[in-house]
Amino acid sequence: MKPVALVSGAGAPSGIGFAIAKALKANGFDLVITSTTDRIKVRAEELGVRGEVADLTKANEVEALLRSIETLDVVVNNAGMTSQISPLAEDDSQSLSDVSIEAWRRGLERNLDTAFNLTRYSLPLIRKSDAGRIVMISSVTGPLQAMRNQPVYATAKAALIGMVRSLALDEAKYGITVNAILPGWISTDTQPEHERLQGMKTPLGRSGKP
């Protein structure tokens, strides 16, 4: 039987989540990929896997998703966003004194609550696996470096590291490993000009590739 992996935030064709899904598929995994929009159906068809539309900030939707999965070996928590690539979150990109309560809560929901919900409801399944794996996609912003006007995003991504450390200790008795990946700026199809400027800050003169 093939191992089964669940990858969140895999709807963007040039994003990290979809790249991870492609790599897992190439390595023999059965997959469930999720996004908040219908474009996940297109990505799923491209890979020949199952795609589900789900808002991972809502516990009831996550619980329903996990009830529809019989076995699960790997969870990749990739859902989330920075305000610099989302016009819907422009008011998050401010100094802390200017961030509204609504923007603060929305940023933590998208970048922290999504990982909490998906991990919490997937644990009963992963604990049954012979080699369960949980991966959090964090960021260099927050845990390793500062970025101006990103207090919400940085806080959420740093908090993921604390979640990883705690989970790793708690779930070791089930043979589950828990790790975080902290990428820098990764090239996507969201803001080419911003990616070019970010690339100027690196030795190779370009952004990372998914």
What are these model-predicted stretches?
Residues 9-13, 99-101, 133-159, 164-173, ...:
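Catalytic loop of short-chain dehydrogenase/reductase
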Residues 89-93, 173, 180-210:
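A glycine/serine/threonine-rich, flexible loop-to-helix segment
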